[in-house]
Amino acid sequence: MSIRRVMHVDLDAFFVSVEQAVRPELKDKPVIVGGKPERRGVVAAASYEARKFGIHSGMPLITAKNLCPQAIFIEGNHQLYREYSEKFMLILSDFSPFLEPMGLDEAYLEVTGFESLHGSIAEMASKIRRRITAEMGINASIGIANSKVAAKIATERAKPNGQCEVPAGEEASFLAPLDIAVMPGIGKKTEQHLKSLGIDTLGKLAALPASFLKSRLGAYAPYLSNAAMGIDNRPVEMPSEAKSISRETTFETDTRNQTFLEAKLSYLSEKITATLRKRGKQARVVQIKIRFADFTTLTRQKHLGQPASGNREIFQTALSLMNGILDSDRQTVRLLGVGISDFCGPEKQLEIDPAKARLEKLDASLDKIRQKYGFSSVQTGRTYRLKDMF
């Protein structure tokens, strides 16, 4: 039986890193996202250059200005951050189908047994980090351990732009010397209370009798006691079912290359139909979204004659919608997205088209391989044109 391996991936200084990716002149400078310091606001994110001055998230902007007068203050662009977050999750889903997003900039991956695909889990983490840097222009840190809590703490030890793996069986010794403040779930008040009792490290917390800890912290005590030793059996939980499924990607360079756009559309269509089939559903509506170089965004949708869940039906419908938009506007394309909605259960068919049956069997085979080994473990002919992204 494989030893459990959980990966926690966190984008370094996410908001600021995105701003620096799209505005290279901000690189290596103290940058603060949150707005102008004259306002009554707080720091949403600070670059590592700004953090050297003691600036951190949640700090009043005016305080940050006093600490670092030369800092560059910017409003932030949450639509842009969401686009980057979607690209981030898309990359992660290529490595494992067991993905639990935690906000825009971090996620857990269940990677138990994936060594055979990548040589080692550490090499898998390196591949993920390289792809994020290459495709998004920002850095990520990764922690690997036998549980979610240990993996998250390992990520903090890896920052910035690094990775840290806790060997199986060494979780308790890894955590023991660390300050209790690093433990997720220990807030300022709990930290102060524990330290007033002389409990300042996770090792000391783990050594406390369960009865004593419960008398001080109540029902939360058993979790903290176990977590301090790296014991955390919580599963990686995928998001609950939504009423629509969509994928979109923002290109590094605006393009009108038809072959490239079709390949990207095919890739996105395969992603959403795989999710649809995993839910045992079919879709009645297909939608396409295109954003041009001037940020004009157009959407089109079509109601299908028959509900569908196959790659081919969804892609061909999306392709027709995409070409309709492109024929009406000659600008280069910045963003491409495809979505499906109005779900229903699979309908019983009195007559089965042999060709359609073969395609359904092919889709099922692809799904089975990808669910076990990750989405990028097998590629179709059209998406193979995008092999550089894998």
From Swiss-Prot:
Compartment(s): Cytoplasm
PROSITE patterns reported in the protein's UniProt record: UMUC
Keywords (A to Z) from UniProt: Cytoplasm, DNA damage, DNA repair, DNA replication, DNA-binding, DNA-directed DNA polymerase, Magnesium, Metal-binding, Mutator protein, Nucleotidyltransferase, Transferase
List of residues binding Mg(2+): 10, 105
Keyword Metal-binding annotated: yes
Family according to the record: Belongs to the DNA polymerase type-Y family.
NCBIfam families per UniProt: PRK02406.1 (NF002677)
Protein known as: DNA polymerase IV
Gene transcribed to yield this protein: dinB
